[in-house]
Amino acid sequence: MLPWFLNHHKQIFDHGVMIDYHSTDRSVEIIREICPTWDIVTSRNQDFQADNIDTEVMDIERDLDGWKIALNVTEQMIGDYSLLDSIEPTQLLLPTLFMVDTDRENIVSHERPLYEQKFHGFSFRDSQRDFLERRARSIHNVSVYYPPTNTPECMGPGRHYHNYNTDKLVILYYGWCPFDQGGIVRKLQIQTQIPLIDRQRGWGFHHITNKETLTYRLENEFIPRSRDLTEEIQQYVTKHKDLSNIL
């Protein structure tokens, strides 16, 4: 997932900060290969305690000027980047297209963007339920506060917002696509770093799972809700190609 994330966002942003949660794979090497000028920050957190992660993100953002957005590697921002020409203090809340792997036999390649290989899922436009499945992300040129508990504006911890204020920029969410061995391993690894305190507070429960449960959710919860999003995705891809620095 990391190569797709990096190759996409290096076309949009002049700089990035990647937080390394003590990875033991080739993640750091891949970042240095694809985005050699980006910063790699080793997380001060030893596990995935959700509120501590959000505090660390806020501290990093505080030292950055201009527009900033905190994303997971399963998320790709895409659309009309001219919105980011504004110098007025602004916070944009971006809704999600939730991508679902409905054709697992279709093997994907890192040589092409995911939006050219996978086309099914559901959209924030489909229903309130579908929007809430993956709430909005914030891109902002002002300081924002990520609350440690749920508020009327933001689901905390986790940095997801309950509403969106533009549909010209969106997030393509690939947490369930592609649903191959790599994707399954990534989803199963998360639970090994969720601390006891988060489990006691009921945080991150959706990460406590196994391969059978993940497969059941994909086949019975997400695939039945999915449709062909090609036309909707293409509108954002066209804007992306018009306005990004595609190499």
Short names for language-model regions:
Residues 21, 71-73:
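Active-site acidic Asp-centered loop
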Residues 1-14:
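Short, well-formed alpha-helical segments that are part of the catalytic scaffolds
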Residues 50-62, 70, 77-247:
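Catalytic-site signature of metal-activated, phosphate-bearing donor transferases
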Residues 14-22, 42-43:
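Short beta-strand/loop segment that forms part of the nucleotide-sugar
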Residues 13, 37-40, 168:
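A generic structural signal for alpha->beta connector loops
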Residues 8, 19-27:
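Ser/Thr-glycine-rich phosphate-binding loops at phosphate-binding pockets of nucleotides
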Residues 4, 26-71, 79:
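Active-site-proximal specificity loops/subdomain of glycosyltransferases
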